[in-house]
Amino acid sequence: MSRLVVVSNRIAPPDEHAASAGGLAVGILGALKAAGGLWFGWSGETGNEDQPLKKVKKGNITWASFNLSEQDLDEYYNKFSNAVLWPAFHYRLDLVQFQRPAWDGYLRVNALLADKLLPLLQDDDIIWIHDYHLLPFAHELRKRGVNNRIGFFLHIPFPTPEIFNALPTYDTLLEQLCEYDLLGFQTENDRLAFLDCLSNLTRVTTRSAKSHTACGKAFRTEVYPIGIEPKEIAKQAAGPLPPKLAQLKAELKNVQNIFSVERLDYSKGLPERFLAYEALLEKYPQHHGKIRYTQIAPTSRGDVQAYQDIRHQLENEAGRINGKYGQLGWTPLYYLNQHFDRKLLMKIFRYSDVGLVTPLRDGMNLVAKEYVAAQDPANPGVLVLSQFAGAANELTSALIVNPYDRDEVAAALDRALTMSLAERISRHAEMLDVIVKNDINHWQECFISDLKQIVPRSAESQQRDKVATFPKLA
């Protein structure tokens, strides 16, 4: 039986309990436990890159991690992955800060990781690469003679040609992506956007619906919407409340709660969300004193100016809205710029009447799915969801909104707050059914199954591919 080798920018610590891990970690651990194998990635620490890999083995899984130098971390991670790819893939070209040394560092680190992984590989290993930090990784492995089946899954959106082609190195990135045998995306829109970008660069031959040839390489594209662990989340949500949360729930028993949580990021649409809530207070005054909106947004990438700007903007907006609409004994908006334990959040989800998830652009958004899974089926809350979240393709029984339209979001919030119990139960049941069917294990099993069906590349085909070129289209 072939081993599974997973490569991601970061690896979850071997001693981290699956229930406290994020969605990616849960899916990867499930796949690795089923097949046995290796999880390879950055340790999260800076230091001497020449040090031997740190290896930890538990059961049939080996964790192998490495350090990065300060320069490599800065160029590969901060200045290219997060200052170029992240904003561009989330349709924010205005925030892209392309620097040639950062691009060189991005390629250099991907080559370095390929060098470190190469001695660990076996001939029949199946290799699964994750996310935008590692777009060139298959290219680097192929250069080193690796003919194994290599799959790639992109967790964030893939932009349309008008956005992607603005990147100075777009053509190189597209050619490198063709070195994968299987390219997985969150949504059909992302898959088609990739093919549109590639078609603008070179000729793409499609042999069947999702099997293609471009740049002399044969590969498949497919959609794999990532899921969650609904049973585990329901268990966490239904458990006893900590004393402080139980007291808060009692104090708010006559108040309807609107709740949001995500890390502080410009892609999440937080300023637009605050303005939509203000529109609710302005246009539907009957809710004054009877609702409370809580936004939890822990700082991420706090050293980046764009993130500092959005934090200050939210602080100002929260103060302004509370000053304008607040009353003695009633604060309409609570904004908390701090981290909360994941299990505690599931309990807060459960007693919230409305889950407000309105990113401007998101690959999937697991918070939306977690909110649904955490609800009491007999008395569920209502999900208000952005049409630009990947989850909107599956959770069609949510109240789907355009996050740029504050009046539409306000109207959806009013509808959610006044929705009948029968409608809430019906909508929740439909969404929960989808979430249970397409859970995290279904996601990884589908991807691995499809990757296994691909015939490995031969040394002869690799050599033949080296001389196959296609001109750019005018």
UniProtKB/Swiss-Prot annotation:
Keywords, sorted A to Z: Glycosyltransferase, Transferase
Record-level GO BP terms: trehalose biosynthetic process
Annotated positions binding UDP-alpha-D-glucose: G22, G23, R263, K268, F340, L366, V367, A368, K369, E370
Superkingdom as given in the UniProt entry: Bacteria
Enzyme Commission code: 2.4.1.15
GO MF assignments: alpha,alpha-trehalose-phosphate synthase (UDP-forming) activity
Residues carrying the site annotation Involved in alpha anomer selectivity: W86, I156
Annotated metabolic or biological route of this protein: Glycan biosynthesis; trehalose biosynthesis
Gene3D superfamilies: Glycogen Phosphorylase B (3.40.50.2000)
Known catalytic reactions: D-glucose 6-phosphate + UDP-alpha-D-glucose = alpha,alpha-trehalose 6-phosphate + UDP + H(+)
Residues that hold D-glucose 6-phosphate according to the record: R10, Y77, D131, R301
CDD domains cross-referenced by the UniProt entry: GT20_TPS (cd03788)
UniProt xrefs under InterPro entries: Glyco_trans_20 (IPR001830), Trehalose_OtsA (IPR012766)
Subunit text: Homotetramer.
Role description: Probably involved in the osmoprotection via the biosynthesis of trehalose. Catalyzes the transfer of glucose from UDP-alpha-D-glucose (UDP-Glc) to D-glucose 6-phosphate (Glc-6-P) to form trehalose-6-phosphate. Acts with retention of the anomeric configuration of the UDP-sugar donor.
Family listed: Belongs to the glycosyltransferase 20 family.
Name of protein: Trehalose-6-phosphate synthase
